[in-house]
Amino acid sequence: MKATGIVRRIDDLGRIVIPKEIRRTLRIREGDPLEIFTDREVKVILKKYSPIGELGTLAGIYADSLSKTLDCTVCITDTDQVIAAAGNGKKELQEMLLSAELAEVFQERKTVLKKSSDAEFVAITKDRSEYSEEIISVILSEGDIAGGVIFLQKNEKKHFGEMEKKFAAGAADLLGRQLS
């Protein structure tokens, strides 16, 4: 018998404490939704729930359409990782974990346009990649942060403007409404 888990008792209200080390490793924060499953072998399985993950196929199609229309890289994320990516460099972004700096931008709950020369330019993932501009728009569902829509530009001759910023905000709004 292998010992890979941690034993916890259930209290009178049916609650189980998830150890801090596991919460930190899996990036589970207070208030995060968890799905509870059971299997035939009497196992209880907890899975971190991602509302944007439920829209995986739609998010992929939408990201691809936006990327072709705007000629840039498009990422659709939940609060932890890139769910869908399209355009130049999508393979290096797909399913990558998001940076802590991006999570802070999400907390501002607004659409931002940043250039790589700006001091507050944010790396999308922990691996820094070469982009000259970015637009970050937060997906809100029933007032909660569900993820983000991110436009990235590698070509330094092309620049994002108000139109692209409105596209990102509109895309985030549409996806947020799909989740509600």
Question: How should each PLM-predicted stretch be described?
Answer:
Residues 3-4, 68-71, 131-133:
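Short, small/polar residue-rich loop motifs at catalytic or cofactor-binding pockets
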Residues 7-85:
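Intrinsically disordered, low-complexity terminal regulatory regions
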Residues 47-61, 111-120, 173-174:
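Short, positively charged
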Residues 56, 60-65, 98-103, 148, ...:
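Juxtadomain coupling helices with adjacent low-complexity linkers
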Residues 64-126:
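Structured interaction and signal-relay segments at domain junctions
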Residues 133-140:
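A short, aliphatic-rich beta-strand micro-motif
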Residues 143-144:
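Glycine-biased flexible loop/turn sites that connect beta-strands or occur in inter-domain linkers
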